[in-house]
Swiss-Prot record:
Record EC number: 1.3.7.7
Names of required cofactors: [4Fe-4S] cluster
GO molecular function: 4 iron, 4 sulfur cluster binding; ATP binding; metal ion binding; oxidoreductase activity, acting on iron-sulfur proteins as donors; oxidoreductase activity, acting on the CH-CH group of donors, iron-sulfur protein as acceptor
Organism of derivation: Chloroflexus aggregans (strain MD-66 / DSM 9485)
Described function: Component of the dark-operative protochlorophyllide reductase (DPOR) that uses Mg-ATP and reduced ferredoxin to reduce ring D of protochlorophyllide (Pchlide) to form chlorophyllide a (Chlide). This reaction is light-independent. The NB-protein (BchN-BchB) is the catalytic component of the complex.
Name of this chain's protein: Light-independent protochlorophyllide reductase subunit B
Coiled coil: none
Annotated keywords: 4Fe-4S, ATP-binding, Bacteriochlorophyll biosynthesis, Chlorophyll biosynthesis, Iron, Iron-sulfur, Metal-binding, Nucleotide-binding, Oxidoreductase, Photosynthesis
């Protein structure tokens, strides 16, 4: 566990809250100080649900530190009286875990009628993803019982959960495809599942677990313990979805169910057209212009692999780089992306990812909320394809990432992300139609003010010498620049107003790359201030 102000994963008890908030008649009680109840606020803010989060904080105050569990039995009794859950999950937060208290004894003293499970979510060993996956697997192991197989072919869907990335939409997409195939659903978990539903998991003919982050271990356990085969692929993209459907039919056939393949039009929203417009879109002149735009992809394991392959295989975009913050899935990501990238970036430090993006300057960044901030800093196009996310990625409309519908959604995101901003480009080219009049009025005129020629003095200190002064003339027809002496250490160049004005005339979609090239030129030649003449010199030398 380490302290950071931006993290890709939440704390361990945040992962516990995701499972409890996903299930019916299950409640989480956090043994935590007042400050650790922020988890409740996160779920209330982001989850598009009219229900209160299924979690309660048993507050440990400063005066309780020596006997912090004294309030826990009363809190558990209050939760049982108010909520009437089938199961209460008790967990210490990342702060109270330091007290090393025996929560089992405190829970027993409460004398509850419902079942109580004390879960050891040690933040020094796990974060959100591992905590959620481990808890869900433990629940499946605890409650799943041998069952007779359902009469008709049915499947379990494991993985959709509270605060999952487009999880509700992905579930709708999976339901649509299964209904088209004539396959019924036995249990969806943890989303909307009860303890009784977990008991029925072994009755299914097949388990579908599309996410590497949640549901994978539970699906593997059901296969090993009860012989329920598992389909662990994520149908992201048109071709992967076709392969996913074929694999599903094969596994059900091995279990004794012959599932006929309906016409592809049956998978479309109207039942008449192609299930996805991506193959057609990829052949149009619009998408032809994207074939040379490099993309950088970063996020969780499932979406990084799926989106990277989709961009490369189906939209024809070169992949400048890819990576994941889910370290325990790094080997799987490397295996899946062999041939797509030379090296997979594996890190949970956003500064490292930001530095890679700054070095690559790709035309499109596919990442998390953090990469959205980084891209904004460098004026790069960005679309969010993975958690962590902000509220704008918890949408009301149907926006899946899985299946044929998901392929159309991702293609739309790529297209609109890369082309939106034309208005900005037109304003740069033809003026702002008076939008900057108030700013110009500060100079005493509403008309455009031409910058007067000026001389800029650049000081480049040398060791054990008086600073050398180089004077650069801005006016003049030729971009002659007096080369200053090389500095002892690399300078961090500052943009002069005339250079910034000239940079704004560069089309926005390559402006970030031009800025980076010019700054690199300035460092190499020791220019502390980037003037218009320095910019022109860099353009001549580098083709910036």
């Amino acid at each position: 566990m380490r302290l950071a102000y931006w993290m890709y994963e939440g704390t361990a008890h945040h992962g516990v809250g995701r499972i409890a908030n996903s299930m019916r008649n299950v409640h989480a009680v956090f043994h935590a100080p007042q400050g650790d109840d922020y988890v409740n606020a996160i779920f209330a803010m982001l989850e598009r649900s009219p229900n209160f989060p299924a979690m309660t904080t048993s507050v440990v105050s400063g005066t309780d530190l020596a006997r912090g569990t004294i309030r826990l039995p009363d809190t558990l009794k209050q939760v049982e009286e108010r909520v009437h859950p089938d199961l209460i999950i008790v967990v210490a937060s990342c702060s109270t875990i330091l007290l090393q208290e025996n929560l089992e004894i405190a829970a027993q003293h409460a004398g509850l009628q419902c079942e109580v499970m004390v879960y050891d979510a040690n933040p020094y060993r796990m974060q959100e993803i591992v905590a959620a996956e481990s808890l869900f697997t433990d629940l499946v192991k605890r409650f799943a019982k041998p069952q007779p197989r359902t009469e008709r072919p049915t499947v379990n869907i494991l993985g959709p959960a509270s605060l999952g990335f487009h999880a509700r939409h992905d579930l709708i997409s999976l339901r649509r495809m299964l209904k088209t195939l004539g396959v019924e659903i036995n249990v969806v978990a943890p989303w909307g599942a009860s303890i009784a539903d977990l008991r029925r998991l072994p009755a299914a003919w097949l388990t579908i677990a599309p996410y590497r982050e949640l549901g994978l271990r539970a699906a593997t356990y059901l296969e090993e313990q009860f012989g329920v085969p598992a389909l662990l692929d994520a149908p992201i993209g048109v071709q992967p979805t076709l392969r996913w459907i074929e694999r599903l039919r094969e596994l059900l056939a091995q279990a004794g169910a012959d599932i006929p393949m309906p016409p592809l039009t049956a998978f479309s929203l109207d039942g008449l057209s192609a299930p996805s417009a991506v193959p057609w879109l990829a052949r149009t002149a619009d998408m032809d212009s994207f074939s040379g735009k490099p993309a950088f992809v970063f996020g969780d394991a499932t979406h990084v692999v799926g989106v990277t392959r989709f961009l490369h295989d189906e939209l024809g975009m070169p992949i400048a780089g890819a990576g994941t913050y889910v370290k325990h899935q790094a080997d799987w990501v490397r295996e899946q992306l062999a041939g797509y990238v030379d090296e997979v970036l594996v890190t949970d430090e956003f500064q490292t990812v930001a530095a890679r993006i700054a070095a690559l300057r790709p035309e499109l960044v596919c990442g998390t909320q953090m990469e959205r901030h980084t891209s904004r800093r460098y004026d790069l196009n960005c679309m969010v394809i993975s958690p962590p996310t902000h509220i704008e990625n918890h949408l009301l409309a149907y926006r899946p990432f899985l299946g044929f519908d998901g392929a159309d959604v991702i293609a739309d995101e790529v297209y609109t992300t890369c082309t939106l901003g034309m208005e900005k480009h037109l304003i740069d080219l033809f003026g702002d139609a008076g939008l900057e009049l108030p700013e110009k009025a500060k100079n005493g005129s509403a008309q455009a003010v031409e910058p007067a020629p000026a001389a800029v003095t650049v000081e480049s200190p040398k060791p054990e010498q008086e600073p050398a002064v180089a004077t650069v003339a801005v006016s003049g027809p030729t971009p002659a620049v007096a080369a200053p002496p090389a500095p002892a250490a690399p300078v961090d160049p500052v943009w002069a107003a005339d250079a910034e004005a000239m940079l704004k005339k560069v089309p926005f979609f390559v402006r970030g790359r031009v800025r980076g090239n010019v700054e690199r030129y300035a460092r190499q030649h020791g220019h502390a201030v980037i003037t218009a003449q320095v910019l022109l010199a860099a353009k001549e030398e580098l083709g910036a």
